[in-house]
UniProtKB/Swiss-Prot annotation:
Major localization listed first in the record, in broad terms: host cell
Organism: Feline immunodeficiency virus (strain San Diego)
GO cellular component term of the entry, any: virion component
Protein name as annotated: Virion infectivity factor
Keywords: Host cytoplasm, Virion
InterPro entries the UniProt entry points to: Vir_infectivity_fact_Lentivir
First and last residue of the signal peptide: none
GO biological process, one term: viral life cycle
Ribosomal protein is among the record's keywords: no
Keyword Lipid biosynthesis: no
Amino acid sequence: MSDEDWQVSRRLFAVLQGGVYNAMLYISRLPQDEREKYKKDFKKRLLDTETGFIKRLRKAEGIKWSFHTRDYHVGYVREMVAGPTTPHSLRLYVYISNPLWHSQYRPGLVNFNKEWPFVNLWIKTGFMWDDIEKQNICIGGEVSPGWGPGMIGIAIKAFSCGERKIEATPVMIIRGEINPKKWCGDCWNLMCLRNSPPETLQRLAMLACGVQAKSWRGCCNQRFVSPYRTPADLEVIQSKPGWCMLWRGKL
């Protein structure tokens, strides 16, 4: 082995600069006896990366997560949930796994970040995996349509609050079934985003009924879904959107 190759092998597992794919490609070219050793070491470092990501996530965003680990043949899958267990309460779910598992066991899945980590994110009532197709906010690190800049930041800020969040609708307010002032501004903003069409008078009216949220910026540069996002994507976390353009219709 040349000096250059030795430097590469020594540094490969300390920093994943080349990404998961390049690391596994490098391992596949090693002799058989070395391949298993380095593959085992690489998987351990992936696990350490994942654990560190989750710790930073919990600390940076202030969310009290509960989570468990499912061990599959390659790597780990973490399923995390934030929110109360009270019936009909909204909960924030996050599904994290490494792309090695998806490449081998979900070969047809193409819409995901091939680096680290793979993340799905959704908000719903009930159990984690019930009818999630319509609930996705983020699929594989890509923000879903309908969730504009700042909206994921609002979800994170709301779930940093311990108040119970429900599926509130304009009809419930009109009938007097709920009092919008009961919730803090952050929780109410999230409930409005979840249950009113974008850029409509209904949403604007719902927001006006609740407590006004205090202006804010993200507490750090934690990017939540991926360290590979662009500075423009960082706005999803750091800045909440203004409400002045939420309705463009005519009276």
